[in-house]
Amino acid sequence: MSVPVRHLIAGAFVEGLGAQRIPVSNPLDNSTLAEIACASAEQVEQAVASARETFASWKETPVSERARVMLRYQALLKEHHDELAKIVSSELGKTFEDAKGDVWRGIEVVEHACNVPSLLMGETVENVARNIDTYSITQPLGVCVGITPFNFPAMIPLWMFPLAIACGNAFILKPSEQVPLTSVRLAELFLEAGAPKGVLQVVHGGKEQVDQLLKHPQVKAVSFVGSVAVGQYVYHTGTAHNKRVQSFAGAKNHMVIMPDADKAQVISNLVGASVGAAGQRCMAISVAVLVGAAREWIPEIRDALAKVRPGPWDDSGASYGPVINPQAKARIERLIGQGVEEGAQLLLDGRGYKVEGYPDGNWVGPTLFAGVRPDMAIYREEVFGPVLCLAEVDSLEQAIRLINESPYGNGTSIFTSSGAAARTFQHHIEVGQVGINIPIPVPLPFFSFTGWKGSFYGDLHAYGKQGVRFYTETKTVTARWFDSDSVAGTNFSIQMR
């Protein structure tokens, strides 16, 4: 019998009252782990009302007390680190080591939120005019919503609600219906850390519940991570209903390999960055651009990828796990077939991959294409699977031009021993996050996650300084205190006197 997935509404864990039921499947064998009873419209309304009511008192809570909640929370997350990683592995299929990294990168954002007193500091200028001072203060927005994807069940929720709540907001989390269990456990620990009931709500469901939140007049801001189509929908629907929205969407990330790079380092980093987590990362390297003589390394890249072995999450020798569901597997295999039809050279074929003991798992083996061109579907589309494409160019300038022509701009990297080449690349590339001899340049949380172009819809990015700005409003105060009864005369201009 499957376990019902609970919602957190108004400080209580409850079962959903909506008509729709969604099974939560184990990607290793597609057995049912749990079942979601979606939230009813009345429950979503109750969650918003509870968040709004709690916000009224939470925003008045001293910032030092809010920071102490975050300090207790990060300590609990560290204490339960392995437990959380096992939940991630069970519902997503990630290897245990990868799942531990998922949890840890989320903890780093909570650690950043612990510094909220400093993050909220405003600015002051004395004597902007005679005896007049101007200063800014930072205030929370109100009820904020986070809609998170399946591929990082711990990290991405932790990108959102701890920082938003530390800034004084209340938060409604709508996790992916494919991986809801991690979010429920994160919420349990948050209450255990001393967060007031109602400051965090967890609502499960699909488009119906998302639409209700996107259009609700009491919701002030929406954070989203997911696919291009849904990301565009969330952004346009949310902004049309006067929400502040940050929407992180698709990606197609390139690694430029210069012939002067350390070959062993290149191959090792490329393999992990392309097929790690079964390629289900928005920052995965899906295209390697071989410059000049680096094209001679193709046989060694193939040999290294051929040694990669998918397997179950508790197999310490497994490099990655299954993809999320049979539909994802079918789509990846369709794109591999289309790549062959369009003329790419298939050097490794991951279709039909089998893992002993798990015949019904969503397995895709490591896949490698050479001779890939920008007009091919395997190049254009975000595959979101363990598929690496190799493109060849003659110069760094051609590599930069190739990447800049992509509609996406999430992440990119260059491997080289030349400082001049690295400087040219970072200056001219039209991508928001750049790695120099770093394959997946996801910044630590005191910087922001800064995707560009079609990878991001909005103005303010996640965590870091931009994350604080996203979850707050700035109020500027100009003040004068009179120290005598004298009146200088009526001022009819806009000058300050």
Swiss-Prot record:
MF annotations from Gene Ontology: methylmalonate-semialdehyde dehydrogenase (acylating, NAD) activity
Q: Which PROSITE patterns match?
A: ALDEHYDE_DEHYDR_CYS
Tell me which EC number(s) this protein carries: 1.2.1.27
Checking SUPFAM superfamilies in the record gives: ALDH-like (SSF53720)
In terms of superkingdom, the source organism counts as Bacteria
Q: Note whether Kinase occurs among the keywords.
A: no
The alphabetized list of GO BP terms reads:
thymine catabolic process; valine catabolic process
Q: Which InterPro entries match?
A: Ald_DH/histidinol_DH, Ald_DH_C, Ald_DH_CS_CYS, Ald_DH_N, Aldehyde_DH_dom, MeMal-semiAld_DH
Phenotype on disruption: Cells lacking this gene grow slower than wild-type on valine/isoleucine medium, but grow equally well on basal medium containing glucose, isoleucine, or leucine.
Named in its record, the pathway it takes part in is: Amino-acid degradation; L-valine degradation
Q: Which PANTHER family match?
A: MALONATE-SEMIALDEHYDE DEHYDROGENASE (PTHR43866), METHYLMALONATE-SEMIALDEHYDE DEHYDROGENASE [ACYLATING], MITOCHONDRIAL (PTHR43866:SF3)
Biological role: Catalyzes the NAD(+)- and CoA-dependent oxidative decarboxylation of methylmalonate semialdehyde (2-methyl-3-oxopropanoate) to propionyl-CoA (propanoyl-CoA). Involved in the distal pathway of valine catabolism.
- Subunit relationships: Homodimer.
The protein in question is named Methylmalonate-semialdehyde dehydrogenase [acylating]
Which organism is this entry from?
Pseudomonas aeruginosa (strain ATCC 15692 / DSM 22644 / CIP 104116 / JCM 14847 / LMG 12228 / 1C / PRS 101 / PAO1)
